[in-house]
């Protein structure tokens, strides 16, 4: 049998088992654990003189209707919270992931995975020197401006979850779309945006009828926010409706402790599944000890990207952010005191440590309301790297690689938000049958700038050169919408998630929606144990004077880094 060197193989087909990949300019290295392509020597590859040719790697007679793939991503390195770090061909058909394995022509190739047959209907992406992840999900979005979609796609985010109606004061502070009319208008508006949406209704009501009204009008879940009164009574009422209608509830708790302390809010949850925003408290919530929520098995904790990783300037920028977002006046002492109560360096530093331990399960952006929607993937990988440098290897990592740590942070922006919202059966990981929302990255730009963003199996967003050039690559290179972002293809490759109540009442027909409309499900049975690679339940103590955080009796702190990877090397500003 003919043999080639490992270096030659990597040049031709990319890395394989045992090879390591550095992620950007970070100190994070992933190592390929498995190669799902069966055997060496029968690799499928597109290009001149390559194997994806008729009668070779391309089956002669199979039609698309009979199962031929629409798209194959060949020889790609998959980094996925469920799959791990693996080498595979990935097949896509009818907008869904068919599977991972060995693609090609079973008449001429050994070990072709069932369903991954290529033929005349198949196009190709050469993944030999690329990394594939699931599209990211931003679980904390203020719908302030539709242009947020462009920034989100430019960092590999393919699903937005939040609420709002534009740059009004309520939306600047709260991620809810309030009432049936506003919900209808937003559902109509997002028809033209090439990204998945879930809209949260206002959960601040002790009356049941207004909450049900939100769900029947198309809300996919609820948000209870302190600006509208996050009282125990409102929380209990909202959770009761959520239990009946199977939708998620997110809560931004009471910073001022006016209606109770963190223990009172936890008691109001009554053991029911709830997603706590700003679990570190800097973005709002019970001061100073909201972090205690990360030790509860029914609470699904997230935090937002402005304080991740905690750098030397993180604390300094928070005060002005809070004043603007929550309609506060720097001339009013009580408003200033409110803002200052959130800015606690000790709890902000502990946030990064708790993420690294898997105690905080998700990362969102808090878009234009303290956070940056185009940096959610980026901040996740930056935090992973900063924590490796500060805390060393994780106990779960194998010698010589950072696979577990990287996968832990990938889970925070992919599968865990999807599970929390009740859409984990549709998106969030690279698994057979799921919607083909996928992101391709060059290793040098991993987490920073994707190469291609696929929505429903079609390219929606890409780093594209001059359209008048002789090649796709001449300058100016910048992100541009692709064909999945135009025409009726947009509606076939993007999903609007709604409650089952709205779905059953025909919300799509009532509002004339052309996008794919899907109901959420399974939200009330999700607990911390379901958070992939992020299910740790520590005992948290917060000193009321110094704000020092102890995790299982150990002070949780690191020195803020003076410089951060994946940062100024990659950006002009």
Curated annotation (Swiss-Prot):
Binding site for Ni(2+) 2: 223, 252, 278
UniProt catalytic activity: urea + 2 H2O + H(+) = hydrogencarbonate + 2 NH4(+)
Active site residues according to the UniProt entry: 326
Cofactor note: Binds 2 nickel ions per subunit.
N6-carboxylysine PTM sites in chain numbering: 223
Top-level class of the enzyme under EC nomenclature: hydrolase
Post-translational modification note: Carboxylation allows a single lysine to coordinate two nickel ions.
EC id: 3.5.1.5
Transmembrane segments: none
GO molecular function: nickel cation binding; urease activity
Stated name of the protein: Urease subunit alpha 2
């Amino acid at each position: 049998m003919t043999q080639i060197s490992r270096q030659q193989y990597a040049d031709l087909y990319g890395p394989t088992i045992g090879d390591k990949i550095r992620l950007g300019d970070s100190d994070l290295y992933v190592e390929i654990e498995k190669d799902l392509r069966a055997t060496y020597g029968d690799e499928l590859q597109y290009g001149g003189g390559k194997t994806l040719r008729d009668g070779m790697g391309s089956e002669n007679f199979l039609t698309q209707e009979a199962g031929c793939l629409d798209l194959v991503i060949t020889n790609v390195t998959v980094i996925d919270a469920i799959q791990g770090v693996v080498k595979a061909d990935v097949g896509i058909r009818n907008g869904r992931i068919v599977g991972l394995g060995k693609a090609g022509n079973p008449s001429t190739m050994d070990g072709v995975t069932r369903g991954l047959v290529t033929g005349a209907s198949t196009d190709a992406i050469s993944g030999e020197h690329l990394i594939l992840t699931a599209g990211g999900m931003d679980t904390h979005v203020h719908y302030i401006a539709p242009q947020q979609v462009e920034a989100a796609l430019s960092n590999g985010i393919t699903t937005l979850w939040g609420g709002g109606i534009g740059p009004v004061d309520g939306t600047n502070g709260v991620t809810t779309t309030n009432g049936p009319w506003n919900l209808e208008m937003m559902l109509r508006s997002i028809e033209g945006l090439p990204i998945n949406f879930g809209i949260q209704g206002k959960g601040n009501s002790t009356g049941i009828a207004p909450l049900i009204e939100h769900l029947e009008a198309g809300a996919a879940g609820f948000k209870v926010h302190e600006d509208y009164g996050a009282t125990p009574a409102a929380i209990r009422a909202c959770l009761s409706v959520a239990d009946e209608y199977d939708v998620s509830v997110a809560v931004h708790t009471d910073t001022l402790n006016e209606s109770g302390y963190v223990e009172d809010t936890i008691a109001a949850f009554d053991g029911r599944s709830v997603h706590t925003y700003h679990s570190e408290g800097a973005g709002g919530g019970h001061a100073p000890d909201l972090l205690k929520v990360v030790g509860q098995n029914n609470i699904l904790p997230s935090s937002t990207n402005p304080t991740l990783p905690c750098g030397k300037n993180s604390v300094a920028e928070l005060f002005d952010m809070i004043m603007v977002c929550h309609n506060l006046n720097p001339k009013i002492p009580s408003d200033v005191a409110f803002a200052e109560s959130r800015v606690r360096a000790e709890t902000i530093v502990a946030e990064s440590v708790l993420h690294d331990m898997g105690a905080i399960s998700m990362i969102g952006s808090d878009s234009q309301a303290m956070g940056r929607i185009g940096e959610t993937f980026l901040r996740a990988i930056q935090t992973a790297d900063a924590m490796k440098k500060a805390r060393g290897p994780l106990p779960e990592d194998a010698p010589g690689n950072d696979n577990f740590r990287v996968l832990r942070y990938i889970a925070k922006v992919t599968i865990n938000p999807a599970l929390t919202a009740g859409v984990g059966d549709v998106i969030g990981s690279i698994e057979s049958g799921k919607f083909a929302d996928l992101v391709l990255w060059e290793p040098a730009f991993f987490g920073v700038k994707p190469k291609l963003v696929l929505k429903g199996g079609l390219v929606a967003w890409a780093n594209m050169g001059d359209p008048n050039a002789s090649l796709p690559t001449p300058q100016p290179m910048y992100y541009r919408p692709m064909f999945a972002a135009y025409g009726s293809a947009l509606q076939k490759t993007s999903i609007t998630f709604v409650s089952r109540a709205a779905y059953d009442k025909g919300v799509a027909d009532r509002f004339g929606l052309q996008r794919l409309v899907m109901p959420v499900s399974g939200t009330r049975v999700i607990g911390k144990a379901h958070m992939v690679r992020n299910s740790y339940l520590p005992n948290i103590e917060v000193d009321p004077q110094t704000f020092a955080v102890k995790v299982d009796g150990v002070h949780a702190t690191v020195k803020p880094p003076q410089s951060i990877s994946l940062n100024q090397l990659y950006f002009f500003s």
